[in-house]
Amino acid sequence: MLDVNFFDELRIGLATAEDIRQWSYGEVKKPETINYRTLKPEKDGLFCEKIFGPTRDWECYCGKYKRVRFKGIICERCGVEVTRAKVRRERMGHIELAAPVTHIWYFKGVPSRLGYLLDLAPKDLEKIIYFAAYVITSVDEEMRHNELSTLEAEMAVERKAVEDQRDGELEARAQKLEADLAELEAEGAKADARRKVRDGGEREMRQIRDRAQRELDRLEDIWSTFTKLAPKQLIVDENLYRELVDRYGEYFTGAMGAESIQKLIENFDIDAEAESLRDVIRNGKGQKKLRALKRLKVVAAFQQSGNSPMGMVLDAVPVIPPELRPMVQLDGGRFATSDLNDLYRRVINRNNRLKRLIDLGAPEIIVNNEKRMLQESVDALFDNGRRGRPVTGPGNRPLKSLSDLLKGKQGRFRQNLLGKRVDYSGRSVIVVGPQLKLHQCGLPKLMALELFKPFVMKRLVDLNHAQNIKSAKRMVERQRPQVWDVLEEVIAEHPVLLNRAPTLHRLGIQAFEPMLVEGKAIQLHPLVCEAFNADFDGDQMAVHLPLSAEAQAEARILMLSSNNILSPASGRPLAMPRLDMVTGLYYLTTEVPEDTGEYQPASGDHPETGVYSSPAEAIMAADRGVLSVRAKIKVRLTQLRPPVEIEAELFGHSGWQPGDAWMAETTLGRVMFNELLPLGYPFVNKQMHKKVQAAIINDLAERYPMIVVAQTVDKLKDAGFYWATRSGVTVSMADVLVPPRKKEILDHYEERADKVEKQFQRGALNHDERNEALVEIWKEATDEVGQALREHYPDDNPIITIVDSGATGNFTQTRTLAGMKGLVTNPKGEFIPRPVKSSFREGLTVLEYFINTHGARKGLADTALRTADSGYLTRRLVDVSQDVIVREHDCQTERGIVVELAERAPDGTLIRDPYIETSAYARTLGTDAVDEAGNVIVERGQDLGDPEIDALLAAGITQVKVRSVLTCATSTGVCATCYGRSMATGKLVDIGEAVGIVAAQSIGEPGTQLTMRTFHQGGVGEDITGGLPRVQELFEARVPRGKAPIADVTGRVRLEDGERFYKITIVPDDGGEEVVYDKISKRQRLRVFKHEDGSERVLSDGDHVEVGQQLMEGSADPHEVLRVQGPREVQIHLVREVQEVYRAQGVSIHDKHIEVIVRQMLRRVTIIDSGSTEFLPGSLIDRAEFEAENRRVVAEGGEPAAGRPVLMGITKASLATDSWLSAASFQETTRVLTDAAINCRSDKLNGLKENVIIGKLIPAGTGINRYRNIAVQPTEEARAAAYTIPSYEDQYYSPDFGAATGAAVPLDDYGYSDYR
């Protein structure tokens, strides 16, 4: 076998019959498989040992040789080579066909490659191949030309003979008729009888004339066919063909079936054909030129690749190794076999029958029928069901052919090459492990023992607990006590990977240090649930074990959960307190007026109370029960930094140093909360809503090392759980309070609704108006009930606390629970005008329950569809972007894109751009950012983090030019500087990072949250697609529904208002031709936009528009934008439109991810004029390749090619990739492979999928070439330094928990006394 690490590219081509015979180890002659009595393979059959190798290691068929010492000997009795049975997986056989057959892929594919090559229509081709028509393969033009006059004379003689015979017969008949009539007259017969005789005579004469005419026509037909006879001409009429052969057989040859195709290909001159086609393309027009272009693609493919087109007609069929189409005995003595064996059997049977018929000299018609059946059986073997009805097995199931083995999700590519099962893995249910630290997970003992079995066995032998591996294995299986101690030792410092399906983004697999736990469930740290999207209602997770030292290092450094706190999509922390933890911290930091021990100022003879000299004193008071953690107090602090605004006031320029004292007016709970934050973090004196907590963790992630952030969130988690327990937040029926005012509110609105009903019955309102009015009324009612509910609930109500703290839920849910449900929609998405007046607390009536189910059912159906759709979108995105890898540090380009940081309000203040987080943040500055005075605020090449953006805004800079992947000049992949900061690490992206896949995951992962439905925008407006369908529409570059026209030029608008349509004319500023858009439906309303005077209003007559501006509501067609404004604008347009959909759902994704995908959509140019290059006009070429070729041609003094940028949808772009392996594993497998084989494509193995398929390390991350061959030689200093780096454990807050022993800790033993 060849080793994957020793080749750099993989080529695919057409196999000729020669190749097939070369691969083969022998010919399969019989259709037999195995002998059912002895169960041994039949000789010369489909499982023959002589051809494919022995079924038992080192043992021949007849048993003469039975040991490894006879290796390589070929037995003289049975002819079997003595070798390993494994060769039955790789040795191929072949079937010699008695008649050639065409390969169905090349004849039946769309477009038909054979048809294009030979210039035959697929219908005609089918007639020839399946013996329905003859085709002329060659004509001896010269001989025909020389003897034409002689032949013509012969033909004239023959025609004369026919005419003479006709005339003679007519003459005789006429005389007989005269005689008959005369006889009748003599007898005095009636006129009636005479007329009958005359009619009969004339009828007979007419028949004579017709018969002669038919004969003459036939001769004329034969002659004209013969004179015009040309190769590749079809003759469907068998009699005509027979006549031609009889008369003029020596002047031409004709045939039917694949043999004729073979002959045509043999006589085909590829170079001459290519030249003539190129000529047609240069001078032709219209359809002719198009057809020539398409044909040239196929012809040029054969010309350039040096493939022989003979490979499309087969004389031999390869037989794949028997182990790949096995036959196994089932327990009932029956056999189960692969469908391929049935298909091969049919081929062999028909082939053998055909050979016999030919030997017998059977009539041509019988032989042809057998050849047709042979052709059909080979077609079924290659691609069953492609032509005609598929061949079915027992139970009417179509048999799986060779093509079906490659195709689809269950095919070879996606099932076995891109997805494999791995050993050293296990799965189990997950439960929460609140005592774990962020980088730990609890692994059940039994599971760990099984996973680490080989390690434990080796260690047992090392420690002399066992003499050899076999006894060690027995010890492990019997679970002797020593085994557990050894397991503890082996497991220490050995990270494991946890994965939860579906793995939508890279945080779906993270590394943890295992802690052994009792029980059979994996324990998961609560803070990583967000990244895995896990909950504990029965979810399962898989555990994988990294084995090699490199794998462990990567797991520990790159994948450890405490190093993956930030989301790769937005760069914001994912490991945040949620649910209970939020409630706990919210409770802890609430300030309750007049709570126990509150600060009282001095009054009269009372001194001030509630003042404490240190947090410790306050905690002691709280323990004594004289102070509540939520009461306002004054406390002297020395270890907490004052808030920024007070710090300057108290400590001047030198700032606060640890130990400096200051007085804080706050609550004990808030002091305790601040003690969880890193030393030197400014005091936060706020109630901890979830948003505030998020902002703090965000800030920590920007300013502190990851390790500190990890420790802080862990402390917050522990405190959160501790105080959530103490807060007593629970939900009971008693907490769901129905507002007492509800009845009177509803009665009031019922009256209003009745009035509307009456108006409707009187005819004052039509049906739609009534519905609209009722919907308005009940919406108001619902809001008012909600208001009443708010006022009625006390602040300490648990339900309101849960909602207010941001832990979960929202006010609408509370209103549904206790107020009223309100209006619900029907399946069409319209409001049902009867509201649901009950709340869930009171219970719904039967009718209310029923109308409520509509919406619920639609919701469930939507979710299911959305999940599938979103998964498919992710798959296409991954496919289009999988080879975008960071290839170099800096491509040195000067280009970039301009992003807005803020806009100036009329009063001169700056309003920060709301989308700064996803546009400017984490980018590299392209040019120096200079303020009005000319000072450089931030230099070119700086990374824009939050501090830099704040500095730019403070200096009054409103927009900056940043580097972007859209303008990156790296030919394959992107450069680190254009990409900017990696969102997941907060540092500049590393070389080798697979940014394409990260981008695809970041866009695809929130896809499930996007709404499915296409929503209506107000009234009758055209449907505007939203949600997931809109994202797909953009990425597939489809023409949108409700397409809006855009201005082709900058100029003034003339708006003409018809009764159903608008007509818009733009008069260009530069005095060019006017641009007219007419027949624009009124349903698509005019666009509202900002005018030059700064006001926002609808487009109207006389307005001034910029080029590319949208004139109507709806969505612009990206292809139009490309045509009018060019590639840069369409890229920005697509990024903006995709972002609008995600922002509407509150999902934050950085622009750079969308840019990576959009860049891939515009990678190609279509050639308009090929100049002196080799490109074919109309072909799609990679932009980098196009520019390189043009530079080369110009350097040699030739004409460069002209091309036009083209926008491709992601599916099309991934199928147009240079890598045939990647395209074939994506979609349309057979079409891609057919094309690749004809073009003799070579795969350079640059992307990820290709390398996964052939089993190489992927060229990304640590698998990239520059990291692959590194030998490490540490210096003395490095050795010394290596041991001083603090590990996560060292500076973890150990005093509270004591040192981690690594032992399994039963949950009950955990004291929660000290919450930190």
Curated annotation (Swiss-Prot):
Entry keyword set: DNA-directed RNA polymerase, Magnesium, Metal-binding, Nucleotidyltransferase, Transcription, Transferase, Zinc
CDD domains per the UniProt record, alphabetical: RNAP_beta'_C (cd02655), RNAP_beta'_N (cd01609)
InterPro entries: DNA-dir_RpoC_beta_prime, DNA-dir_RpoC_beta_prime_bact, RNA_pol_asu, RNA_pol_N, RNA_pol_Rpb1_1, RNA_pol_Rpb1_3, RNA_pol_Rpb1_3_sf, RNA_pol_Rpb1_4
Domain of life assignment: Bacteria
Reactions performed catalytically: RNA(n) + a ribonucleoside 5'-triphosphate = RNA(n+1) + diphosphate
Keyword Magnesium: yes
EC numbers, comma separated: 2.7.7.6
Cofactor mode of binding and number, as noted: Binds 1 Mg(2+) ion per subunit.
Entry keyword Chaperone: no
GO molecular function: DNA binding; DNA-directed RNA polymerase activity; magnesium ion binding; zinc ion binding
Positions bound to Zn(2+) 2: C891, C968, C975, C978
Binding site for Mg(2+): D535, D537, D539
Gene Ontology biological process terms from the UniProt entry: DNA-templated transcription
Residues bound to Zn(2+) 1: C60, C62, C75, C78
One Gene Ontology CC term in the entry: DNA-directed RNA polymerase complex
Cystine residue pairs: none
Cofactor(s) demanded: Mg(2+); Zn(2+)
Subunit structure and binding partners: The RNAP catalytic core consists of 2 alpha, 1 beta, 1 beta' and 1 omega subunit. When a sigma factor is associated with the core the holoenzyme is formed, which can initiate transcription.
Function field: DNA-dependent RNA polymerase catalyzes the transcription of DNA into RNA using the four ribonucleoside triphosphates as substrates.
NCBIfam families assigned: PRK14906.1 (NF011498), rpoC_TIGR (TIGR02386)
Record family assignment: Belongs to the RNA polymerase beta' chain family.
Protein name: DNA-directed RNA polymerase subunit beta'
Organism: Mycobacterium tuberculosis (strain CDC 1551 / Oshkosh)
